[in-house]
Every structure is written in structure tokens, then in C-alpha cells.
Amino acid sequence: MPQTDKQVCIPPELPELLKQFTKAAIRTQPPDLIQWAAEYFGAMSRGEIPPVRERSEQVPLSNWAELTPELLKVLHSRVGGRLIIHADELAQMWKVLNLPTDLFNSVMNVGRFTEEIEWLKFLALACSSLGVTIAKTLKIVCEVLSCDHDGGPPRIPFSTFQFLYTYIAEVDGEISSSHVTRMLNYIEQEVIGPDGLIKVNDFTQNPRVRLE
């Protein structure tokens, strides 16, 4: 193979382009990520609007069940508290609930999951297909994970919230790590009580908590 002295020049705007691509992929949930990526970047190169579905658009699901927080809660209970689950087993659980296969594949692609899946990360991305904003996505995750049966507001350990918020913000790509750290520090120091739990109201109705 002939050698070349040419250097590959990486444009400075590439990181931002990739962030926008990742966010668009999560919003659109394409069944074939590779084909959609080709169409996305092809449109960008031609100066056209890329094929990004808005949150308000409805996806035709034919005979599939519609993904809901209630079904995600059922799925979470079947995972049984495991942190890691095998892809084939999770796919079978998803199938038993009659959930859309294309959505499962899209979450797998966006999360870059392989055979061993970190369940909380998969759950966070699945919830992001229902939530318009990061705050609403985290609200749904809290509702799914909460084990309270006393009729109180959904709540989860702050450590779990910290993990989920950091991950979702990283995938979203538009929120600086410094902002995430600042919000988490404020919540931990000013909001969280002795029980170490965070309630949905703590980050949805507190004017000083702005997750985005």
C-alpha cells in the first residue's frame, strides 16, 4: 500500500455536528440507524433540512403496543434489580410485552449497546423517547424506578438520579459538564434530606433547579 504524507484534517465543528446528530437520532428513533445516518448527513451536505422527526409526530405502530411508563415499569420489574442484562434476554422481554421492535433496535443503536447492557442506561434512553425534555425524561425514569406504595410522590436514591442525569446529559450533548456538576451539587447540598432520596418535585418545581 503506497504511503502518503497527507494529514487528515478534522474540522473544528465536527464535535458539535456529532452532538446534534446524536440528539436527532434519539428524537427520531430510526429503525435503521445506518441508513438514516446516510440520509441525515447527505441532507446536511446539500444544505437541506435533515430527516429529524419532531416529538409531536406520532409513529405508526400497527399492531404493536405503545410504549408507556407503565409498561417500562413492568419491564423494570422483570429485570429484577440486575444492573446488567443480556441483550437477547431483554429483547425477549420486550417482545413479550409486544413493544415495537424498531424502537428497541433504535435504543440499542443510540446507546451503542452490545451483548451486555447496562439496564439503567437502556431505561434512560427508552424514557427519552417519551420525554420532551431532560427534566421530563428524568421524571418518567423516577416514576418507573420508584418503589413507593404509600401514594407519595415518586422518589429514588440521589446517587441513581446523579448517574441518570449525567448519562442523559452526556448523550444529549448540549449541556456542559460544568452545568451538570453545578446542578447536582446544589441538589445534594440544598435539597436532599437525610434519607438520601430525591422526589420528582425536587427537580420539576424548584425554580433554582434547571437541568437544561
Curated annotation (Swiss-Prot):
Subcellular location: Cell projection, Cilium, Flagellum
Keyword Phosphoprotein appears in the UniProt entry: yes
Keywords: Cell projection, Cilium, Flagellum, Phosphoprotein, Ubl conjugation
GO term, biological process aspect, one: regulation of protein phosphorylation
Major location (coarse): other
Cited InterPro entries: ROP_DD
Residue stretches making up the RIIa domain: 12-43
Interaction with RHPN1: annotated span: 209-212
Any GO molecular function: identical protein binding
One GO CC term, this protein: motile cilium
Modified residues (Phosphoserine): 56
UniProt PTM comment: Sumoylated, sumoylation decreases upon spermatozoa capacitation conditions.
Matches recorded under CDD domains: DD_ROP
Family from the record: Belongs to the ropporin family.
Note: 'Ropporin' comes from the Japanese word 'oppo' which means 'tail'.
Domain writeup: The RIIa domain mediates interaction with AKAP3.
Function: Important for male fertility. With ROPN1L, involved in fibrous sheath integrity and sperm motility, plays a role in PKA-dependent signaling processes required for spermatozoa capacitation.
Subunit structure as annotated in this protein's UniProt entry: Homodimer. Interacts with AKAP3. May interact with SPA17. Interacts with RHPN1. Interacts with FSCB; the interaction increases upon spermatozoa capacitation conditions. Interacts with CFAP61.
Protein name: Ropporin-1
